[in-house]
Amino acid sequence: MRVWAVANQKGGVGKTTSSIALAGLLAEAGKRVVVVDLDPHGSMTSYFGYDPDSLEHSNYDLFLHKGSVPQGLPGQLLLSTSDERISLLPSSTALATLERQSPGQSGLGLVIAKSLAQLWQDFDYAIIDSPPLLGVLMVNALAASQQLVIPVQTEHLAVKGLERMVNTLAMINRSRKQALPFSIVPTLFDRRTQASMHTLRVLRDKFPEEIWQGYIPVDTRLRDASRAGVTPSQFDGKSRGVLAYRALLKHLLAQQLVAQVA
């Protein structure tokens, strides 16, 4: 199983949409995908019609065992989605309490990695929707992953947030055997605005090697898919947003192949 994290230390950049869009396209290609909602706000969980405040069980259960994960527990927590090839490991608001509980508890940074290790025979891909704050949850997402997607909204405050994320990644990489490859993905691009055009140029100038040369445009069909509770490609496989995500997926698969060869 390949594990991808979608993360940025800034909210509202399209993390959840990107996670679900990529999962939907992988499922369309016949892959089995587990999507992991690690954001206490539960946007991914809500997307598929579940209420993070009322779920009896969630991935918070995985963190209740001081770093060990009981055999079989991850599989018991999985929920169905709009696509039979996509399963959801849901979030709950209780995840927000982990940051207060985590000091002094060893092993909490590897809970998701250990959980996904139990599911590797059942899925081809795992996609983790990370919270926007650096803490035990983001550390879990990055520690479990072999590849990182960093969505960046094309607006003037985005570059600062991206720089913080890149610095965080450098810190995480010091404890990894291999550096985590990443792709910067410009999102919510609107060619009609100077802000989008300027930010895209700045991102390409500052991160020429790391940035994907395409972009995800503003597309109301992506919002409509969310309202319908289905993946963007299920809702409208030929929308501008989905076509952009198809190109992004092709780029990520090529990057994955390079990493595997290396």
What are these regions (language model features)?
Residues 1-262:
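P-loop NTP-binding core
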